[in-house]
């Protein structure tokens, strides 16, 4: 039994955690913030990082420092009934009631919908959602492989695709960011508005939810002692947070620079679409579709897995993990 993850293991666990955190909303919010903030992008980004990165890190660290197995055990220190109520409410909110369905709709809206005629969009969304959640369920039924699926395959693929977009944009800026005027609330309150936008990613809640997966994965890597699990959980959280912060800032800068050519878009998804087409032409839509599909897929897998593992613990005499995974996938599809 060892005390510390190897550097390679730590990187893969951090990659897995980052992959679960970083979904479509984490792309849409910063690029749109950058467009609106203009030359105030640095102040806006500072606020965004406090709530969009700092709070999720605190959530992961809280589980690590407390040396608890998950949110249920942590919140049950107030009382068992409260712990069950709070845990169920949080997981259902960031799971099948909101965040998981959004993974399918956002990836469809940004990546697939532009290729479909108006008359076929509803049917297209239904078919896409069915396939999307079938894939999510396939990966979620094997929670012991989540480090491989997300940390070693899906997240590296996502980072390669996103890096292609970001590097191209940064090395050929569409405009001089320092000359772009701020818009809306960013004119006089860039920092505070960025603070709110970072909170809107909902990762503050996800930090508590994903902790159980990180703890289980670290234990599967032959680290069993509670203190060692806690220390390595925090290490993985720090590595993941640093990567999140870097990408948030770079994507926000791309958004700010885009104002040199384009007016403020209706939303972050539209911003990504026009910037992608500007740099890559029509193939840019395919790149964009892949970026959002992979981003949403890995987050949905993480959410279904964490919901299934948690509800199996809450109701030890109830359905098995695999049944819970099916239930949450079906609820999200419907």
Per-segment meaning from a language model:
Residues 4-8, 34-59, 78-87, 124, ...:
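Extracellular loop-to-transmembrane helix junctions
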Residues 6-17, 42, 80-94, 124-131, ...:
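Select transmembrane alpha-helical segments in multipass membrane proteins
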Residues 33, 105-124, 219-220, 300-327:
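Helix-loop-helix connectors at the membrane interface of multi-pass transporters/channels
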Residues 142-153, 191, 214-243, 260-273, ...:
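Hydrophobic, small-residue-rich membrane helices and short re-entrant helix-turn-helix hairpins
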């Amino acid at each position: 039994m060892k005390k510390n993850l190897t550097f390679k293991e730590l990187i893969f666990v951090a990659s897995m955690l980052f992959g679960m955190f970083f979904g479509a909303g984490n792309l849409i919010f910063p690029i749109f913030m950058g467009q609106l903030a203009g030359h105030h992008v640095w102040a806006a980004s500072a606020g965004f990082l406090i709530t969009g990165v700092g709070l999720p890190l605190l959530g992961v660290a809280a589980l690590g420092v407390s040396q608890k197995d998950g949110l249920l055990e942590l919140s049950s220190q107030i009382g068992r009934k409260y712990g069950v109520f709070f845990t169920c409410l949080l997981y259902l909110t960031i799971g099948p009631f909101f965040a998981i369905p959004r993974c399918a709709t956002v990836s469809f809206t940004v990546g697939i919908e532009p290729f479909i005629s108006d008359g076929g969009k509803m049917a297209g969304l239904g078919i896409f959602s069915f396939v999307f959640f079938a894939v999510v369920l396939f990966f979620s039924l094997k929670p012991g492989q989540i480090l491989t699926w997300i940390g070693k395959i899906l997240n590296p693929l996502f980072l390669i695709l996103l890096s292609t977009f970001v590097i191209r944009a940064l090395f050929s800026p569409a405009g001089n960011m320092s000359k772009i005027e701020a818009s809306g609330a960013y004119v006089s309150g860039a920092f505070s508005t960025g603070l709110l936008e970072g909170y809107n990613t909902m990762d503050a809640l996800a930090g508590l939810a994903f902790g159980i997966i990180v703890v289980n994965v670290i234990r599967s890597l032959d680290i069993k002692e509670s203190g060692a699990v806690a220390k390595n959980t925090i290490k993985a959280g720090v590595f993941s947070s640093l990567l999140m912060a870097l990408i948030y800032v770079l994507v926000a800068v791309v958004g700010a620079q885009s104002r040199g050519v384009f007016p403020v878009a209706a939303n972050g998804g539209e911003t990504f679409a026009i910037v992608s087409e500007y740099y890559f032409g029509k193939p840019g839509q395919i790149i964009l579709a892949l970026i959002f599909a992979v981003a949403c897929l890995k987050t949905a897998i993480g959410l279904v897995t964490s919901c299934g593992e948690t509800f199996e613990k809450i109701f030890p005499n109830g359905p098995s993990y695999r049944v819970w995974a099916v239930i949450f996938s079906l609820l999200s599809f419907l």
